[in-house]
Amino acid sequence: MDKNIIIGAMTALITPFKNGKVDEQSYARLIKRQIENGIDAVVPVGTTGESATLTHEEHRTCIEIAVETCKGTKVKVLAGAGSNATHEAVGLAKFAKEHGADGILSVAPYYNKPTQQGLYEHYKAIAQSVDIPVLLYNVPGRTGCEISTDTIIKLFRDCENIYGVKEASGNIDKCVDLLAHEPRMMLISGEDAINYPILSNGGKGVISVTSNLLPDMISALTHFALDENYKEAKKINDELYNINKILFCESNPIPIKTAMYLAGLIESLEFRLPLCSPSKENFAKIEEVMKKYKIKGF
């Protein structure tokens, strides 16, 4: 299998709700907007997609909508398929594969704090259950466990279809260390604030929250960097600084969904508890940044 399979500019899709249910029409419309604005892949039902509060049926529906909407285009679907129970993660991975996803993104098991050996066996079981690309997802600030550099490299070398890692630890040194020890690995940025540093240090793509709102800018930033035009990439990165900052003023995806609502891109600003709407102060800050960027609706 070609391990360079799903790279470039990717969007961690939000999941719009309406009257307490997944707004399927809005979801498909958001994906079409990504397709039209230069995104290489969409990532349904990840952290930004509120996967933790979706039912398994809703999770599967979102994957099906993404696959159907991207059918016939060059845009790939990297479906979220993570769980803190290995058998559930395997089941989600198999569903994604059987329903046409091009690959899966699998977050490290959360809450139960497995050892590195447990993490290795967890991911090996997932990789062996499907024959599509698997991207590891390291986000210790949410999961409570870190996939070590050694474990990531061992999984990459032992499992043919594990092609890289989405790094959202905020640790640039770790990212550089990973590529120094295994330069064939596909390192993907999982934090908009460090997209440019990762891309300019050998990263091969981003999974962006900001690109829900500004897919064209994230696409341009990513492709300039991949073409080694770092001057233009940094210019765009600098332009995105303020909005990247405000889109993480509260827990993701609260700010990005608020921004999408203010821009008229989703009909209803709904979350599922324990997530809730932003504070009045942060709502006002998001509005102000939207005005500065002259985003649709302002």
Curated annotation (Swiss-Prot):
Q: Which SMART domains match?
A: DHDPS
Cellular localisation: Cytoplasm
What residues form the catalytic site here?
A: Y137, K166
Q: Where is this chain primarily localised?
A: cytoplasm
EC number(s) per entry: 4.3.3.7
Q: Which residues form a coiled coil?
A: none
**Site positions for Part of a proton relay during catalysis, renumbered to this chain?**
T47, Y111
For this protein, the record's SUPFAM superfamilies field holds: Aldolase
Binding, pyruvate: T48, I207
The record's GO molecular-function terms, alphabetically, read: 4-hydroxy-tetrahydrodipicolinate synthase activity
Q: Name any Gene Ontology BP term.
A: lysine biosynthetic process via diaminopimelate
Q: Which residues form the signal peptide?
A: none
Record's keyword terms, sorted? Amino-acid biosynthesis, Cytoplasm, Diaminopimelate biosynthesis, Lyase, Lysine biosynthesis, Schiff base
The cellular component terms of Gene Ontology attached to this UniProt record, alphabetical and capped at eight, are:
cytosol
* Keyword check for Lyase: yes
Q: Which reaction does it catalyse?
A: L-aspartate 4-semialdehyde + pyruvate = (2S,4S)-4-hydroxy-2,3,4,5-tetrahydrodipicolinate + H2O + H(+)
**Involved pathway(s):** Amino-acid biosynthesis; L-lysine biosynthesis via DAP pathway; (S)-tetrahydrodipicolinate from L-aspartate: step 3/4
Q: Member of which family? A: Belongs to the DapA family.
Give the protein's function.
Catalyzes the condensation of (S)-aspartate-beta-semialdehyde [(S)-ASA] and pyruvate to 4-hydroxy-tetrahydrodipicolinate (HTPA).
Q: What's the subunit arrangement here?
A: Homotetramer; dimer of dimers.
Name this polypeptide is given: 4-hydroxy-tetrahydrodipicolinate synthase
Q: Please name the source species.
A: Campylobacter jejuni subsp. jejuni serotype O:2 (strain ATCC 700819 / NCTC 11168)
